[in-house]
């Protein structure tokens, strides 16, 4: 009994130490009012912004000395409107260049902190890298990463996806040089942590729906899919694109009928694509794991199976406050298309789709889900 009590006390001490350690972490999200104010501060402190401001000194002298105001005005307008664009471009390139020079240290921090796909696990990595980059004069302020999600996204776009897409060792060495062994070690640590998370979803079934027999799919509530879609685009996510579509209708009133039909059809198609992309963008890695686990563990096959998966995921995403109601998927066909388009198709092509993630850490589980679908269709 005493030994058990001592073990429990030790485990509590370890947990409390970790909690205290996490409380000590200070990131820019704790210091700035929003990511926008942090971004403005970053721009203000950048060299490109200072150069842009200094350009106004010779321009003001030119205005005083010149007898013809047209040329100074033209140059001033160019500097005024194009200057901020160049400042932003140079700022982005500077961030990318600074981080690319510190890949080895990035990997060391990942190996030491052992983060998983949970964004909170990346807080320590983000804080340590912020300090390291500033102290080693790789960045001019202490706030390189705004929060843990920014650090995780940088890992994904800088290390995880580019490295995973390299086909052979020579290509990896050519792109990442001496950082290759450190990257391999960091990715190994990350994949092990992701696998632990996956086991919680797939083996222990951490979530199970209650009262699902009363749940209805949107196809049972709406007569047409178009009415469901129009209701969806009325939310805040699609308000600006929808207003843009109405503006396009007004602008195209002078076109001939054929051109107007083609133009508005293309705009509507882009609007639908935007809506489809938003659905996958708001899903975290946890939600994607639950989706794949639900597919793998579904007992029914065919259309009924996908309808059941759609019901479960509609309930799950509503309970997790990802979606405002239980209408994320219209029906089983929509659910199957979603899996095929945003998961299996990306895996097959191994090429990112615009701003969408490759989901590299989910590749083994996507294959498993696709295999279970194939087995069900053959059964």
Curated annotation (Swiss-Prot):
A Gene Ontology biological process term: protein transport to vacuole involved in ubiquitin-dependent protein catabolic process via the multivesicular body sorting pathway
Family as reported in the entry's similarity comment: Belongs to the DUP/COS family.
Keywords associated with the record: Membrane, Transmembrane, Transmembrane helix
One GO cellular component term: nucleus
Membrane topology (UniProt): Multi-pass membrane protein
A Pfam family matched in the record: DUP
InterPro entries with a match to the protein in the record: DUP/COS
Subcellular location: Membrane
Record carries keyword Nucleotide-binding: no
Transmembrane segments: 43-63, 70-90, 233-253, 255-275
Protein name, per record: Protein COS4
Organism of origin: Saccharomyces cerevisiae (strain ATCC 204508 / S288c) (Baker's yeast)
Predominant cellular place of this UniProt entry's protein: membrane
Gene: COS4
